[in-house]
Amino acid sequence: MEAAIIDAAMDREREGDRQVSVELVERAVRGDRGAFERLVEPHLLVAMGAARLITGDEADAADAVQDALLTSWQALDGLRDPQLFRAWFRKIVIRSATKFVRGRRRLVELDLDAAGPIDSVEREFDRRQLTRAFARLDPKDRVLLTLHHYWQMPVAESAQLLGLPEGTVRSRVHHALKRLRACYDAEVRR
C-alpha cells in the first residue's frame, strides 16, 4: 500500500516538473509564497520519504524537509534554470537530512512493501532486519542508496547532485550495496 502511495507521489512529482515555468519561479523569487508553494508541493511527499530514509526518524525528517523548504525559499534566486528545480530541491533536501543525521544517529525505517507479495510475518521480519542493516550504514551510503534506489535517480543526475564523477557514484553505490548486503546477512544470522 505504501509503495503505491510512493509511486503515485513520484508520478505527481514528475508531473510537477513538467508544470514548472520560468514565470512561476520568477514570481516565487519576487516573494510570491503561493508560487513557491506550487513549485514545492508536488515534491513534498517524496522529499519526506527520502528524508525519513536518511534520518531514520519521522520527526527529524519533517524538520529536515522544513529546513530544506526554508533554505530553498531563501536561495531560490540562485536557481539558474527553472527546469532543474526538482534536482535543485532534492539536493537541498539531501543536505538538510544529512545535517540532521550528523547530530542524531537513529534506526532507519525502510519500506519493503515494494518487495512483492511476501507473507506479512516474513515482510515484518525482513523489514526489521533491513532496517537494522540500513541503520548500520554510514550516512553517505544511506544518501547514495536513497538517491539510487528510493528516488531512482540516474547516475548522471546523482553525480551532478553530489558533485562527483559518474564513475565514482557508480562505484560508491556498488560498494554501499555490498555493505548493506553484508549488514543484512549479519542481521539474518543473529
Can you say where each PLM-predicted feature lies in the sequence?
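C-terminal edge and immediately downstream basic/flexible tail or linker adjoining helix-turn-helix-like DNA-binding
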Residues: 2-12, 27, 123-124, 132-136, ...
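Internal acidic/polar
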Residues: 4-9, 14-21, 99, 105-133, ...
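Short, charged helix-capping/linker segments at alpha-helix termini
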Residues: 12-15, 27-38, 48-67, 166, ...
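Sigma70-family region 2
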Residues: 29-30, 53-56, 66-84, 103-107, ...
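Residue-level preference for hydrophobic side chains embedded in well-ordered alpha helices
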Residues: 39, 43, 47, 68, ...
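Short helix-capping/turn signature of helix-turn-helix
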Residues: 42-45, 54, 146-154
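Arg/Lys-rich amphipathic alpha helix in sigma70-family domain 2
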Residues: 74-81, 91-111, 123-126, 175, ...
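Helix-turn-helix DNA-binding module
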Residues: 135-143, 151-168, 178-182
